[in-house]
Amino acid sequence: MFPIDFCHIPISIIKRSAGRSAVAAAAYRSGTKLTNEWDGMTHDYTRKGGIVHAEIMLPAYAPPEFADRSILWNSVEQIEKARDSQLAREIEAALPRELSGQQQLALVRAYVKDNFVDKGMCADFAIHDKGTGNPHVHIMLTLRPLKENGQWGAKCRKAYDLDENGQRIPDGKGGWKNHREDTTDWNDKGNVEIWRAAWAAYTNRVLEAAGQPALVDHRSYKRQGIDKIPSVHLGPAASQMEKRGIRTDKGEVNRQIAADNKLLKEIKARITRLYRWSKDEAEKPQTQQSS
């Protein structure tokens, strides 16, 4: 059986309440200079290295000008009025080192188109690779649906509560009981598992087509039934420090995990050898001892 690696796929929401902006995130991911028209701040990441490819993919009804990164994300910033607005969804995924740059790009395009763009989301992705063995992709996705006229639609709408006969329920104040519901299913909790499983499936398909035996699985080692301790995610700051030879706390944790996994592998190998020896001994013909 080919080795199966756990692929860590963080999925998060870019929120204004956390001091973040979609424009700043897009500038950093793409290594460009963008000005956020909502707060007037300019974010210049043109000196950032390791940006292999950046691209915007648009769904039906999206205005052609949204192919411009500044226009797209400033449009998002302007439509979201609240200080605690959710601005974008971000997905990060490691790219197989066994694939060429063109194969990695084809993988990302197919995954993004089928899972997000065809569902109505605008996608802005950037592939990062500094040549240190950690190629990965950042995928930013819009959260609002687009109307047929190219304008942003509503994220949610008012829906009336109904009784068993399908009739509206009075609220006792001259109105009707109601609740808010999303206009799309993009926020369904089950999507996290679906999107992660899809990434693993698309990746394995491309690896197989390229004649590579390696496989990936979006499930944790525990869910796979594999006795292996997963490493912790370093994050950009710790990664940069480690690359410069500066040892970090997270780096130390990962080094200890690697040592523990090596020891665990050795112990399992010894147990396997002991099991086989005991099985062989049990199968040997028994000789009677003379009294």
Features from the language model and the residues they span:
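N-terminal nicking endonuclease/strand-transfer module with a His-rich metal-binding environment
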Residues: 1-291
